[in-house]
């Protein structure tokens, strides 16, 4: 075990030395050509930004939020292919509800409802070109699908007025002159007579407007009519009688897009807030060392990386999704974090060194730290690229590319800015009025004395902080807090709900929300339809063919939560009696009557349930006449997604028993139910892979067993808190929250890696000195970074939408937990555990000419072992060992 630890330590030392030397060399090169570096990086960003000419926004909830390997996606494709010969489907749902919440079957409400239905069918028109079109103009063979409501309301009104009883308006289906009309898909919140099942009240009525389009012109006509319908429903908001609601796949996509559009202008507000914060927290009293302009360019740096990364992806043909809207906010916060670390490292370099040396030393100091955090962020997001959900894939591609560009621009663009800033410092130019010279002070001034007092106060605060960390009672206090925290978070993880509903994609004031909530609370409970596609019917003339189909139908009619035969739509039920009429009593299946049957007005609606081949094949009684067909039956009392998934799996299992018929089931909302199949295992595997990658990085850069175990435990603890808090913040596990969890993993490692790296690399024999050195070196930049990130993200709290609020809540949470673990928990744990580090010789500053011209770095000495508070110490005892400690602390305080 000791040899493995020693080997890891040697590997880490070699990586540390090579990384240090590489960044030192890069710093020298940038210092040699700062203006060329700025020019090249800026031009590249502008060239890539030209990719906006290929910008294409897409937004389809079904396509982008369902996994590519989910059963529902295949089932949807089968359904689309079935209707493809007719054209592409267009579907809008309109619901009517009494303004006072009462029954719609009261006389004046029925009149109003019929008036609305007639208006929507014939009088509401959308314009295209020089013509206007109503629904009746483009519905074609689908017009009858919206007739059930008008038939029911008209007959109910006539029955109330004339007191006739020749038609019984029963529920869930009624018989109209020999034709059964199923009402449970249109009439909801029904009160019936317990004896006769006759409908007495109904508080909600839904009308389904179906149509088929075959070309882009027809699609545009329907979309225009849909927008007119949407505008009309908004106008009924204050109607004294009836409130009208509408939803459709197209309107849902538009609402999701509206969320993104509303968030984008806030990017400007975020930029100004971050700019002000960055400038104010990097100002110094010394007008030469202060860096307001550099801070401004530091905030511009992530903007350039966004232009370059987004443009690059647009050039490559990637499409933009609304969920990508939050990427600029995240990259701005990540990029500004690196600016604080860079400026902090610059101020720690000796002022008397040349600009060239200072840049090399700055990059050698800050480069590895920034590399670790950038690598962890990149890996946590890049792993999401392999998830099967397109929305997560697209989000992760955009943010991963942006992280790479941000890292490159921080290393090159901002380093070049610091070089020019250093040249200004050398020339003693004013940071605010850079054309003015600032004379050297001849003697200490009052302000400088005051600055020394401030430094002393900060030093005392740091000492108090370290005293708290080193105290025994603090370990018991934090231990009790952490145990309580883990218990509550573990409980939250066990209770987290899974699933995405369409209402989570809307703004809180979306006009679609009322109907979506009615669907969830009322329609899902009272009615739904499952369609069964028979893709390979075979020879229906065989004696066992039709009986087998009817047995399958019966199995679905009596399955769990099924309504029964009253809800069934099966074309064979009217067709077989028709064949009997033609055959004078025999009802054996015949193909030759199919074309004639579907042309008859009373049976025309059944033509949508079959795919016929060549008509001549039908006349010749060939099985190729009937290529496919579909039937459907109703179900109810399936409100939760877990209940609906149980039904789906039961139906799929039944369908799988008939491989020779190639049965496929389809239900409109199966994409949401199927997320329970994929989101949990995908989240588990993705998070597991991300955590393994984080642990490998921490092991590579800080190979001490103490730092490996503690930092890994800290990352796990932070993420346990993030996962556990989801249930307390009313957030479910869905594709949206999954992307934020990937982000949380990367962010959590940032805080842990910074403090662990500074603790590990410190060459001190005292735990107190090592912890003090780590906190003095990174606490303030960590605070700046965390605060700036929260400022960047909390602006989005103005957007009242679940899709955006999830990011805000999780980012604020992970920053709070990360800072608490990084600045309090880990230092206390470090103070309680022994620490052993394989250490090479103290790094010697290499002269620029040696690094740049003389070739390789001088050979390192043999590694030594430093044991903090141990019994042995293989390094020579130094009587002046506290001197470097105090020197480091004073340097950190000056920064």
UniProtKB/Swiss-Prot annotation:
Membrane topology summary: Multi-pass membrane protein
Protein location: Apical cell membrane
Xref: PROSITE patterns: SSD (PS50156)
Signal peptide: none
Organism superkingdom: Eukaryota
PTM (free text): Degraded in a lysosome-dependent manner before hatching.
Predominant subcellular localization, coarse grouping: membrane
Record key words, sorted: Cell membrane, Glycoprotein, Membrane, Transmembrane, Transmembrane helix
Ranges of biased composition (kind: Basic and acidic residues): 878-895
Biological processes, Gene Ontology terms: endocytosis; molting cycle, collagen and cuticulin-based cuticle; nematode male tail mating organ morphogenesis
PANTHER family: PATCHED-RELATED, PATCHED-RELATED PROTEIN 18
Function field: Transporter, which promotes the endocytosis-mediated degradation of hedgehog-related proteins such as grl-7 in order to establish the capacity of progenitor cells to maintain quiescence in arrested L1 stage larvae.
Protein name as annotated: Patched-related protein 18
Taxonomic source organism: Caenorhabditis elegans
Gene encoding the protein: ptr-18
């Amino acid at each position: 075990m000791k040899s493995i630890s020693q080997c890891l330590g040697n590997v880490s030392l070699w990586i540390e030395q090579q990384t240090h030397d590489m960044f030192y060399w890069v710093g020298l090169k940038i210092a040699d050509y700062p203006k060329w570096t700025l020019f090249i990086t800026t031009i590249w960003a502008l060239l890539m930004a030209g990719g906006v000419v290929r910008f294409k926004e897409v937004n389809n909830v079904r396509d982008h939020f369902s996994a590519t390997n989910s059963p529902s996606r295949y089932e949807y494709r089968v359904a689309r292919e079935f209707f493809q010969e007719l054209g592409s489907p267009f579907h809008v749902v309109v619901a009517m509800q009494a303004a006072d919440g009462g029954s719609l079957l009261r006389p004046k409400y029925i009149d109003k409802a019929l008036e609305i239905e007639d208006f929507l069918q014939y009088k509401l028109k959308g314009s295209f070109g020089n013509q206007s079109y109503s629904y009746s103009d483009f519905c074609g063979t689908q017009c009858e699908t919206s007739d059930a409501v008008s038939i029911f309301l008209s007959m109910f009104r006539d029955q109330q007025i004339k007191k006739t009883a020749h038609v019984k308006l029963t529920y869930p289906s009624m018989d109209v002159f020999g034709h059964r009309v199923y009402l449970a898909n249109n009439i909801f919140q029904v009160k019936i007579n317990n004896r006769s099942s006759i409908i007495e009240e109904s508080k909600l009525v839904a009308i389904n407007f179906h149509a088929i389009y075959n070309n882009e012109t027809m699609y545009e006509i329907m979309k225009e009519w849909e927008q007119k319908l949407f505008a009309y429903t908004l106008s009924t908001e204050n109607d004294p009688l009836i409130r009208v609601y509408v939803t459709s796949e197209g309107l849902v996509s538009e609402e999701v897009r509206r969320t993104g559009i509303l968030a984008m202008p806030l990017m400007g507000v975020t930029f100004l807030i971050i700019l002000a914060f960055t400038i104010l927290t990097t100002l110094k009293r010394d007008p030469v060392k202060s860096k307001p302009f550099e801070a401004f360019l530091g905030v511009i740096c992530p903007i350039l990386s966004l232009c370059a990364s987004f443009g690059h992806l647009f050039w490559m043909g990637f499409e933009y999704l609304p969920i990508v809207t939050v990427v600029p906010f995240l990259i701005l916060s990540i990029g500004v974090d690196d600016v604080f670390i860079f400026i902090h490292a610059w101020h720690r370099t000796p002022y008397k060194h040349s600009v060239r040396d200072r840049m090399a030393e700055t990059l050698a100091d800050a480069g590895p730290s920034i590399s670790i955090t950038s690598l962890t962020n990149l890996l946590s997001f890049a792993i999401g690229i392999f998830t099967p959900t397109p929305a997560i894939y697209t989000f992760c591609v955009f943010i991963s590319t942006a992280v790479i560009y941000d890292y490159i621009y921080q290393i090159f663009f901002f380093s070049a800015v610091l070089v020019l800033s250093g040249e200004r410092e050398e020339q003693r130019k004013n940071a605010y009025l850079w054309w003015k010279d600032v004379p050297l002070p001849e003697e200490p001034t009052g302000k400088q004395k005051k600055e020394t007092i401030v430094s002393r106060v900060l030093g005392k605060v740091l000492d108090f902080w370290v005293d708290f960390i080193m105290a025994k009672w603090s370990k018991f206090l934090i231990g009790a807090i952490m145990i309580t925290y883990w218990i509550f978070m573990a409980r939250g993880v066990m209770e987290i709900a899974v699933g995405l509903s369409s209402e989570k994609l809307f703004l809180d004031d979306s006009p679609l929300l009322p109907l979506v909530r009615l669907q969830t609370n009322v329609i899902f409970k009272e009615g739904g339809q499952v369609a069964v596609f028979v893709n390979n019917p075979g020879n229906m003339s065989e004696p066992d063919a039709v009986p087998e189909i009817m047995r399958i139908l019966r199995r679905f009619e009596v399955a769990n939560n099924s309504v029964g035969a009253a809800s069934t739509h099966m074309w064979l039920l009217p067709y077989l009696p028709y064949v009997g009429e033609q055959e004078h009593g025999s009802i054996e299946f015949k193909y030759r009557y199919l074309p004639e049957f579907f042309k008859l007005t009373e049976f025309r609606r059944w033509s949508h349930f079959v795919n016929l081949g060549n008509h001549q094949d039908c006349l010749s009684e060939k099985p190729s006449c009937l290529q496919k067909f579909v039937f459907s039956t109703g179900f109810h009392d399936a409100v939760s997604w877990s209940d609906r998934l149980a039904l789906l799996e039961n139906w799929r299992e039944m369908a799988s028993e008939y491989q020779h018929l190639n049965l496929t089931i389809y239900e409109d909302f199966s994409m949401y139910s199927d997320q329970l199949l994929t989101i949990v295992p995908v989240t588990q595997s993705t998070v597991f892979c991300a955590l393994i990658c984080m642990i490998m990085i921490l092991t590579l850069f800080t190979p001490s067993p103490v730092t490996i175990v503690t930092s890994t435990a800290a990352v796990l603890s932070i993420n346990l808190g993030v996962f556990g808090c989801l249930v307390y913040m009313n957030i479910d596990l869905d594709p949206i929250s999954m992307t934020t969890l990937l982000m949380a993993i990367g962010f959590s490692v940032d805080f842990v890696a910074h403090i662990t790296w500074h603790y590990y690399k410190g060459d001190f024999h005292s735990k107190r000195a090592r912890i003090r050195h780590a906190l003095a070196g990174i606490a303030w930049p960590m605070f700046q970074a965390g605060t700036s990130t929260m400022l960047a993200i909390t602006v989005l709290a103005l957007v009242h939408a679940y899709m955006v609020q999830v990011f805000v809540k999780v980012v604020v949470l992970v920053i709070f937990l990360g800072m608490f673990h990084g600045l309090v928990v880990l230092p206390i744990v470090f103070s309680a555990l022994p620490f052993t580090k394989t250490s090479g010789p103290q790094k010697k500053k290499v002269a620029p000419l040696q690094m740049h011209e003389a070739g390789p770095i001088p050979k390192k000495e043999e590694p030594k072992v430093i044991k903090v508070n141990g019994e042995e110490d293989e390094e020579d005892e130094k009587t002046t060992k506290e001197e470097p400690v105090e020197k480091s602390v004073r340097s950190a305080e000056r920064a």
